[in-house]
Amino acid sequence: MAKVFVVGIGPGNYENMTVRADRALAECDVIVGYPVYVDLVKNRYPGKELVSTPMTQEARRCQMALELAKSGKTVALVCSGDSGVYGMAALVYALRGENSEPEVEVVPGLTAACSGGAVLGAPLTH
């Protein structure tokens, strides 16, 4: 049985994606996400199966990622910013329930708040 990486891809460009996120996306068989986020990464990771669902279909998207992993595929569920801050990580764990399968690995990303503060010259220090 494979796993689900819940991947925070940062605020929207490859330069702000973590090395760990890049590795998870390179390793996966399937990239699942909101269409805009899938579009942001698909050209960098050719040959991947791409699955997307529209806005308001977050639970369905997470369930699809879990089902794909249960079928033996390694899945990257992509989220903007950090996957644990208004991302899909909590929902994936909730939908998986108390089962230990499929394995879930949360890959944090750069939050939009931190990125925005840096761009504006106003880092979030106080």
Language model regions located:
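Class I S-adenosyl-L-methionine
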Residues: 1-107, 115
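Active-site histidine-anchored catalytic micro-motif
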Residues: 110
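Short, glycine-/small-residue-rich phosphate/pyrophosphate-handling segment
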Residues: 117-126
